Amino acid sequence: MRCLLDTHIVIWAMVGSKKLSSRARSMLQDTENVFYVSSASIWEVAIKHSARPDEIPVTAEQMIRFCRNSGIWELPVQFRHSQAVSSLPPHHNDPFDRMLVAQAREEGLSLLSHDRQLPPYGEFVIFV
C-alpha cells in the first residue's frame, strides 16, 4: 500500500507516543507499505513548532531527518495539488489537512490519519 502520512502520525511515531494506535504501528512496520510525507507537513511543523513548541515537540529539521532515516519519501506540493484543494468539499477548514487530502487524492495514495474530520473525504482516508 502507498500511504501519505498525516503530520501528527509522523510526530507520534517520532516521539513514541501512546496516541499512535496499534493498527498504525502495524502499518508503519509493514515493509510492503511505502510511505510519503508532504512538504506541507514539514512547513506545518516549522510554523507550529516556532509558535507552540510545547504542543509540537519536534522541529522541521528533526522531522526531515526522521523521514529520511526511516525511508519515508518526500511528496512535494505541486500546482495540481494546490488547484485540487479548491474542488474539495468543506468537511475540514485546516489548510494543511486539506492539502494532504488533495495530494493523496491526486496521487492515488491512502491517507493515514487520526483526524475524525478526514474520513468523509473518501475511502482513501484510513482512520488509525
Question: Where on the chain are the PLM-derived regions?
Answer:
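Short, well-structured N-terminal submotif of metal-dependent ribonuclease cores
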Residues: 1-37, 50-65, 107, 116-120
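Generic structural signal for small/hydrophobic residues in well-ordered secondary structure
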Residues: 7-8, 45, 85, 104
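Alpha-helix capping/helix-boundary segments
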Residues: 9, 41-42, 81, 100, ...
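Residue-level signal for well-ordered alpha-helical positions
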Residues: 16-17, 48, 88, 124
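General small-molecule cofactor/ligand-binding pocket signal
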Residues: 36, 75, 126
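Short secondary-structure capping/turn micro-motifs that flank functional sites
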Residues: 44, 65, 83-84, 120-121
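Active-site neighborhoods of divalent-metal-dependent phosphate/nucleic-acid chemistry enzymes
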Residues: 57-61, 68-114
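Active-site regions of enzymes building and remodeling cell-envelope glycoconjugates
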Residues: 122-128
